[in-house]
Amino acid sequence: MLFRISMSATEFLLASLIFCLVFWVIRASRPRVPKGLKNPPGPWGWPLIGHILTLGKNPHLALSRMSQRYGDVLQIRIGSTPVLVLSGLDTIRQALVQQGDDFKGRPNLYSFTLISNGQSMSFGPDSGPVWAARRRLAQNGLKSFSIASDPASSSSCYLEEHVSKEAEVLISKLQEQMAGPGHFNPYRYVVISVANVICAICFGQRYDHNHQELLSLVNLSNNFGEVVGSGNPADFIPILRYLPNRSLNGFKDLNEKFHSFMQKMIKEHYKTFEKGHIRDITDSLIEHCQEKQLDENANIQLSDEKIVNVVLDLFGAGFDTVTTAISWSLMYLVTNPRVQRKIQEELDTVIGRSRRPRLSDRSHLPYMEAFILETFRHSSFVPFTIPHSTTRDTSLKGFYIPKGRCVFVNQWQINHDQKLWVNPSEFLPERFITPDGAIDKVLSEKVILFGLGKRKCIGETIARWEVFLFLAILLQRVEFSVPPGVKVDMTPIYGLTMKHACCEHFQMQLRS
């Protein structure tokens, strides 16, 4: 009996010693906090894995709940890596806009190194002058071949011309499906239509809806968001990269295929390039490459490989977000037929049936705009921005944040914050309409989907225009529905962009 007590005491002392040692190591590894500041609060995590189990399959929901307890600035660990989590509109604006230079970095995550060989403008760790110059170049190219007018076209700009053409083709494809099987999965056709718009802008060409190479790429695109979504364990626990992982393998395959596709397109452009006859974004980048200078001030060279990376970023930015937005919009239309009828009544009143909707109609269609805003808010299909990191030691709301800290920005929390929204779980486009029938500008600016500040999505304006025009043309011509009794699954599937479950039961009829 004495021996057992002695052993128990020894074990207790040993366990206490180990606990104290671990506690001391954790405390010692924390950065020294300057006087007057404090460490961000947060729950204790498990050894080695941190808060992975707490995040679960829906990190945006778990971290939103956590923010209710710990506040808008909190800290978790994924593996052994500390991660700052920001919530609340005012806090996020403070960090990304007012303190934009402090929070404009990108963490050097493993999945990010697989995109464009680690040289992606959107995902790469660079945030210095080279990155800024490449971003300006991409913005200018995007503007020149989307918002700018085409002298040879009756459309107001290139984007309107491309979207109008693809929307008409899309309606024809859906009519074929109704004449055949009698139902369809809209995502299968929307994804090619949207891809064709960005292909026209980047490469000056479109593809048939049955083009196998393009189909292969877009069908793999869901895997991209699954891997690079905030909180992927393989980014924070290195050993997981070497275990069997179907998603990660698919992600590598997708990036290789996209890179190969872009290289082929750019090689073809080089063969037919004519100085002074710039056809698309790729041509404009080749021209800059040959001049060996990005702009007059930076004197930064743009290599052939950088052209591939810039085009890849533009293609990704202009494809997945718009496809997901339109797809979610169609889901909300069939589950809210009252809203669909109200949009169509507005279209009939403002535009009629004698001409096609144009981008210039957008300001005269407030209910359509309110529907799009509510789709963005309610679905919050981009739950987090691409993770940020701090570029230097800084502070936020009285908390000390060291240089190099990985930062998650919870956009979903903003869009469902009960402090900002009445009944946030309810889908109600009318919340954005003022008593005099206009869009509530102040409220609309509280919907955050494209990020803020220096890392804000460069294609935001074009994406909003494209979503509007696709939906306006479709809803002027057709009505969407599902058969009576069919339940539509609106549960989001977590990723960088959250998709909904596949719905094969869509039906469409031309409006009388």
UniProtKB/Swiss-Prot annotation:
Annotated GO MF terms: estrogen 16-alpha-hydroxylase activity; estrogen 2-hydroxylase activity; heme binding; Hsp70 protein binding; Hsp90 protein binding; hydroperoxy icosatetraenoate dehydratase activity; iron ion binding; monooxygenase activity
Single GO cellular component term: mitochondrial inner membrane
This protein's UniProt keywords: Cytoplasm, Endoplasmic reticulum, Glycoprotein, Heme, Iron, Lipid biosynthesis, Lipid metabolism, Lyase, Membrane, Metal-binding, Microsome, Mitochondrion, Mitochondrion inner membrane, Monooxygenase, Oxidoreductase, Steroid biosynthesis
Biological processes annotated in GO: estrogen metabolic process; fatty acid metabolic process; retinol metabolic process; steroid biosynthetic process
Positions of the UniProt region annotated as Mitochondrial targeting signal: 29-40
Pfam family, one: p450
EC identifiers of the protein: 1.14.14.1, 4.2.1.152
Reactions accelerated catalytically: an organic molecule + reduced [NADPH--hemoprotein reductase] + O2 = an alcohol + oxidized [NADPH--hemoprotein reductase] + H2O + H(+); estrone + reduced [NADPH--hemoprotein reductase] + O2 = 2-hydroxyestrone + oxidized [NADPH--hemoprotein reductase] + H2O + H(+); estrone + reduced [NADPH--hemoprotein reductase] + O2 = 4-hydroxyestrone + oxidized [NADPH--hemoprotein reductase] + H2O + H(+); estrone + reduced [NADPH--hemoprotein reductase] + O2 = 6alpha-hydroxyestrone + oxidized [NADPH--hemoprotein reductase] + H2O + H(+)
Membrane topology: Peripheral membrane protein
Annotated heme binding sites: 457
Source superkingdom: Eukaryota
Sites where a glycan is attached: 67
Subcellular location: Endoplasmic reticulum membrane; Mitochondrion inner membrane; Microsome membrane; Cytoplasm
Residues binding substrate: 224
Subunit structure: Interacts with cytosolic chaperones HSP70 and HSP90; this interaction is required for initial targeting to mitochondria. Interacts (via mitochondrial targeting signal) with TOMM40 (via N-terminus); this interaction is required for translocation across the mitochondrial outer membrane.
Family the UniProt entry places it in: Belongs to the cytochrome P450 family.
Name this protein carries in UniProt: Cytochrome P450 1A1
Source taxonomy: Eukaryota, Metazoa, Chordata, Craniata, Vertebrata
Record gene name: CYP1A1
